[in-house]
């Protein structure tokens, strides 16, 4: 499965959160193209606006009100940094229809700070997902033990997060295999592109049994960015996966709505929709003039 993090991790591109216009555009694109899981809100997670002063964003209540028309179209939830846990924020998310909160803490800190947040999320009737941030701080075996502990207290999903984009495909393979062998809950992988390996690492995770891949439209995320959602859909469909996701609806939405909206933020899309289609189809870019002429002739 695929979890799109554009509206959470991608919000780092513009500050700590997208404005209402772009938030709605992204929600439209993701739900209309059948993306199954969406993480949204303040880049620092629910509560970060007040607790951490991440005010370059809408408030949590504004995001939660804005998302109401989209509930039921995808599984929608928010991030929760374990260090910023406040029970009323978890209760608020549940009351506003969130399907999950993804608790996050640095790898190795789960026993110290994550037990109460995870149990509170479950108590409030939501799924408890987890991000082991900076997963490379632990050996694969240590990471697997942390996943086992979290599973034992009710966790529903465990994410291996390559926060600095430093992991190599072999690192991803070992970490994913260890975690998959240790737990029965789904294991996800969240890559960053600092070494240009986001796609290679996502494929390594998939081939090693990962159940969920994190990504963001146009690669939007902190630092060097994430795995582009549209690229993930394109290459995973070559593996016979993500068949229910409408790649062309997604690309049209990016081309016609999201790219123009992001011009005010001077965001550069490294793999524009046209170039992605060339990769999907195996057509060399030198055929561009012919494609355009045929398109013009056929309307």
Which residues does each PLM region occupy?
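Catalytic cores and adjacent flexible loops of soluble metabolic enzymes
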Residues: 1-299
């Amino acid at each position: 499965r695929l979890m799109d993090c554009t509206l959470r991790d991608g919000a780092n591109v513009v500050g700590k959160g997208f404005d209402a216009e772009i938030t709605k555009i992204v929600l439209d694109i993701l739900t209309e193209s059948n993306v199954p899981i969406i993480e949204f809100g303040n880049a620092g997670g629910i509560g970060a606006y007040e607790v951490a002063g991440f005010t370059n964003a809408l408030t949590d209540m504004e995001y939660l009100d804005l998302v109401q028309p989209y509930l039921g179209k995808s599984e929608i939830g928010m991030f929760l940094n374990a260090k910023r846990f406040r029970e009323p924020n978890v209760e608020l998310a549940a009351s506003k229809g969130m399907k999950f909160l993804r608790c996050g803490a640095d790898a190795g800190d789960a026993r110290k700070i994550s037990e109460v947040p995870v149990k509170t999320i479950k108590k409030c009737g939501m799924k408890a997902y987890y991000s082991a941030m900076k997963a490379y701080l632990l050996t694969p075996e240590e990471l697997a033990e942390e996943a086992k502990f979290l599973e034992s207290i009710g966790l529903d999903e465990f994410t291996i997060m390559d926060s600095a984009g430093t992991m190599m495909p072999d690192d991803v393979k070992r970490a994913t295999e260890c975690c998959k062998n240790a737990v029965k809950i789904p294991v996800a992988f969240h890559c960053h592109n600092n070494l240009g390996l986001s796609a290679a690492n996502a494929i390594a995770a998939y081939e090693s049994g990962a159940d969920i891949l994190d990504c963001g439209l146009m690669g939007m995320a902190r630092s060097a960015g994430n795995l582009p959602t549209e690229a993930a859909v394109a290459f995973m469909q070559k593996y016979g996966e993500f068949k229910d996701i409408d790649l062309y609806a997604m690309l049209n939405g990016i081309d016609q709505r999201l790219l123009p909206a992001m011009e005010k933020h001077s965001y550069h899309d490294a793999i524009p929709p046209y170039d992605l289609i060339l990769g999907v189809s195996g057509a060399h870019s030198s055929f561009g003039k012919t494609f355009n002429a045929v398109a013009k002739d056929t309307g």
